Amino acid sequence: MHHLRKAFTLIELLVVIAIIGVLIGLLLSAVQKVRESANRMACTNNLKQIGLALHNYHDVNQKFPPGTVGINNPPFHGNVQFFLPYLEQQTLATHYRWEVDWFHRDNQPVVSRQLKFLQCPSAEPNREQKDLDPMVDGKVGACSDYAGIREVPQELVESGWVSQPATRDSIFMMDSSSRIADITDGTSNTILYAEDAGRPQLWRDGRPVPGELISGGPWATRNLIWGTASDRGTPPWPCAINCSNNREIYSFHPGGANVAMADGSVRFLKVGLDIRILAALVTRAGREVVSESDF
């Protein structure tokens, strides 16, 4: 008597393949979540390092570095050059020439240097930019995923989206410096540095805009952001977080972006944050009332 060996039917085989596919998908999703969690933590540490360096600079100089210098009176320099020594980059700082513009050929070996602590691991690594700013004559600089914030744009006030603050200025300004004593809104309620990742490619809502590049990406240029999305609004208020990286707070982290506060802490600002709250966090002495639970 012959015993027939039971074989898989086609349907059973397809079911097994489908189950394996689902398991692989779940595994890949879990791996991606773990990787992103690690990236976000590394990004947080980068901003903590930047915040500490800025506070050390302040301790020595009794003020923060300017946002940029030389706009109207060259030579032209960005913000990061001022505190490179406090980021354990003394050798790089020593080779930087202050008597010429950052984009001068003599400074190219310095400003084209890729600095890991200025790159969020969730973004594409080792980007550089032939800067589109007409001031810099197309010179190349290594890009940064972080920037200081300059001010609340006047257009937000004029449009009625935010109330007129006592001052629209943030901590970093053109050709001038601020002190901790100037941050009367409170250091825990004022943003010092923030993510603006992915430059020079223009990104909107997690997608690259084909053929569109933006200026301001190199860490050595006037790498300041506004803290609001000027080129994309979401009624009834303009978009605040992760809407565009055109000089606005933008990251590749799901659900929000990291910012370094003036007290040295790092906060994760969530997508959907009220633009009025963000504006209050941008100003250093706007006299707005903000509580920690608001953000």
Q: What are the language-model segments listed below?
A:
Residues L4-N39, Q49:
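N-terminal single-pass transmembrane signal-anchor helix
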Residues V22, S37-F295:
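Surface-exposed loop/linker segments characteristic of extracytoplasmic
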